[in-house]
From Swiss-Prot:
NCBIfam families named in the record: PRK11027.1-1, PRK11027.1-2, PRK11027.1-4
Protein known as: Macrodomain Ori protein
InterPro entries tied to this protein: DUF413
The family this protein is said to belong to: Belongs to the MaoP family.
Amino acid sequence: MAESFTTTNRYFDNKHYPRGFSRHGDFTIKEAQLLERHGHAFNDLDLGKREPVTEEEKLFVAVCRGEREPVTDAERVWSKYMTRIKRPKRFHTLSGGKPQVEGAEDYTEADD
């Protein structure tokens, strides 16, 4: 991976991970460092803005297109990142579900 995925800028995703990859808890320290170091190259290869140069980059693009399963650390961490940012956000409410209406109990009248 020495000549593969070269980039000069560190990668940060302020929209999905405003406190950074390592502080969010989705990624291990190693995965967060890999994303920060090579994230721009991963993103450019995934979007087609950059042509793959090495064999490793060509295999990475195949993983991004869904043609093969992720094998290397770079492929696994990018797949994990993409799944995390594409999943719908879960939110929790404080209400108990359906709204309660007063006086809507079930009454049955019995003839005595």
